[in-house]
Each structure stands twice: as C-alpha cells, then as structure tokens.
A protein has these predicted regions:
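Bacterial N-terminal signal peptides that target proteins for export
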Residues: 1-9
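Bacterial N-terminal signal peptides
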Residues: 9-19
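Sec/Tat signal peptide C-region and signal peptidase I cleavage site
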Residues: 19-25
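Short, glycine-/small- and polar/acidic-enriched structural segments
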Residues: 25-177, 181-187, 203-207, 212-213
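Predominant activation on well-ordered alpha-helical scaffold segments within soluble catalytic domains
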Residues: 46, 92, 147, 191-194, ...
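Pocket-lining segment of extracytoplasmic ligand-binding domains
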Residues: 170-264
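Secondary-structure end/capping motifs
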Residues: 227-312
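Conserved C-terminal helix/tail region of periplasmic/extracytoplasmic solute-binding proteins
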Residues: 299-341
Length: 341
C-alpha cells in the first residue's frame, strides 16, 4: 500500500511538473501567393508547409491564394498578411511611387512569361491590335508583361490600342475553350491548353527576350513587421531555402508534383512543370534569389514605362526610383544561413 501511495505521489508530481513546464507556441504567419488557383511559383510554399519544413522552424504558416500578385502586395502593405510572393516590377513601382514600406527578403529571378496566341497567323503586333488579351487583373503581373511588350515592341498603349480581359490565373482555360485568342501565360500553361484544345499554342513573344535579365518575383514584407518579428522572418527565409533545396533534388520530382496539387496541376502536367522550372532555376538554387542586376533592371524598366506614359504607368518621372539597398533586406538570409537545420 505504501508503495502504491509513493507511485501515485510520483505520478502526481510528474503531472504537475508537466503542467508547469511552458509550451512555446509556434509563430503564426499568413503568406499570400498569386492566382486563384495559385500559379505554379507558389508550389514552394505548399512544399514547405506539407513536408513539415515550416513546422521544423517553429512556424505555423497559413497560405492565402489571392487574385493576383499585385493584390497580394497590397495586402502586405495594408498589414492584412505577413508576406507575399509578388511581381518585382509591380513592387518596385509601388515602393517608388507611394513610398510603400516593403522589403524583399527572398526572390525568384527568372521570369517564364510568354505572350501567346491560339492562331499561328495571328502572332504579331498588327494582329494583336484591338484584340482582347487575357491577363490576371488590371495592373497585375500579367498586365505588366503585356504592357511592357506593347510599349517596347509594338509602340502601342495597353487598354487604348489593346484591351485586356482580367481572368486571374484562368487565362489558359479561356484560351483552350476558344473564349479568347491571346493571353499572357506561364510556360506550364502551354501543355495543358494544347491537350484541352487539341491545338498548338503559338508564342508571340518571350518576356525574357523583350526585357532580358529582369527580375521576376519577390517575397516581400513590411519593414515594421520584420523589425517586430525578425526572428520569425529569419526562420521563414530558412524554410524557403530548405524547400527550394528539396525541389531541386531530381529524386523528389514525383513528390513535388503531388504537393503542387493546390495549383490544379496534377499527374504528367505537374511533373512537366517541376522539371521545366527546375531546369531554368525558377526557384533559387542555393541562393537568396535577389540578384542586384535583375532587380535594378526591373526598376529601370519601370522608369522607362513611366517616361513613355508620362506617369500613367511605371515609376512616375516625378518620383525617385527605389535603390537596391532600399528595396531589399539581405540580413535575414545571412542569419538564416547560420541556423539551417
């Protein structure tokens, strides 16, 4: 009986000790990704979440798909989300024109955009004039690519000479069904459209050829939020690095393709996308993905757009363009490298 009493007392003590031991809550973050459904670039967030990488760094991340990367950037600026994957050219314009307190903390350098047509005989500036072109949203990422192409190659004005049709990330579906002939696409849209329509998709222009060396996407956050939760953001950057490393291992192709399910790419389409994007280092391979030359090319392009449109688009000529140092926070990456798990 005495032995039983001792055991019970010990059990009670252990239970009391466990109750008294503090449990450290995971840091909650909401991160926005462009497109409904999400574009394939956002796959990296689902990889980090669903393989437990975020959890490994004590992060509880909610991924929020938004109509466009532009809308996602505005959500960061308003404080309604903690970070977003947003088009670099939109962000540098936003910071330059409005003084938005945004910092790029990670990035994707290589754009995959193409201007495409379902008709081989309609693949020129003359053919696109007056035709509706599928984009994500007004002044969204696809809209910006079209505007750049029209201004640089066609000497035309978007909306005035070429109207746009906002469709979030459903441009490909609209082209496959015959609703529109022209659209701004990601390369992973092409095989899906061709299978659905039974027709070939024709490339009118590659944005990488129109504006060589321009930066594609930035993971952005408000400077004040970074200051307030810096340790959490360091761990977030570390998680992005680990997820990118996982994606770049060819042995993980099938696994990554399955994790891309939220993008609505499945089976062979998802495997095609993973391989194609890995080849072009769509997600950075061992780097931060915020190369100075590409980011400053994005700034220069938006300065040019601003001059050509007299401030109606791009960076307003009356504003001072953002510098590389103002646009980026590289210190999070440096600290993240010290704590890679």
């Amino acid at each position: 009986m005495k032995k039983l009493t001792t055991i019970l007392a010990g059990t009670a003590f252990a239970a009391g000790l466990a109750a008294a031991t503090p449990t450290f809550a995971m840091d909650k973050m909401t991160v926005a990704t462009p497109g409904i459904p999400p574009v394939f670039a956002g796959t990296i967030l689902y990889v980090a979440r669903d393989t437990g990488i975020f959890k490994k760094y004590n992060l509880d991340v909610t991924i929020k798909a938004m109509n466009s990367g532009a809308a996602a950037a505005k959500a960061v600026d308003s404080g309604s989300v903690d970070a977003s994957l947003s088009p670099s050219q939109f962000v540098v314009r936003m910071v330059s024109n409005a003084g938005a307190p945004l910092k790029a903390i990670w990035g994707m350098e290589h754009p995959d955009w193409i201007i495409a047509s379902m008709d081989a005989s309609k693949a020129s500036c003359a053919a696109i004039k007056g035709q509706g072109v599928g984009v994500d949203s007004k002044r969204g990422a696809r809209w910006i690519q079209l505007n750049t192409y029209l201004a640089r190659k066609c000497k035309m004005k978007i909306e005035k000479d070429v109207p746009t049709v906002p469709m979030s990330s459903n441009v490909g579906t609209a082209m496959a069904s015959g609703q529109i002939n022209f659209g701004v696409l990601h390369i992973d849209d092409v095989p899906v459209i061709e299978r659905m329509s039974g027709k070939k998709v024709h490339t009118v222009a590659r944005i990488e050829d129109v504006v060589p060396g321009v930066h594609y996407l930035m993971m952005i956050a408000r400077a004040d939020k970074i200051a307030a939760k810096r340790d959490a953001y360091v761990r977030f950057v570390a998680a992005m690095r680990d997820a990118s490393k996982m994606i770049h291992d060819p042995a993980n192709t099938d696994k990554i393709a399955k994790l891309a399910k939220p993008t609505k790419r499945t089976g062979a389409d998802a495997i095609y996308a993973v391989n194609a994007y890995r080849k072009m280092e769509f997600w950075p391979n061992g780097t931060l993905g915020l190369g100075k030359s590409r980011i400053m090319k994005a700034v220069a392009n938006q300065v040019g757009v601003g001059k050509r449109t007299k401030g109606r688009g791009g960076i307003n000529p009356k504003k001072t363009p953002v510098t590389y140092e103002q646009m980026t926070d590289l210190t999070l990456w440096e600290d993240a490298k010290k704590m890679m798990k």
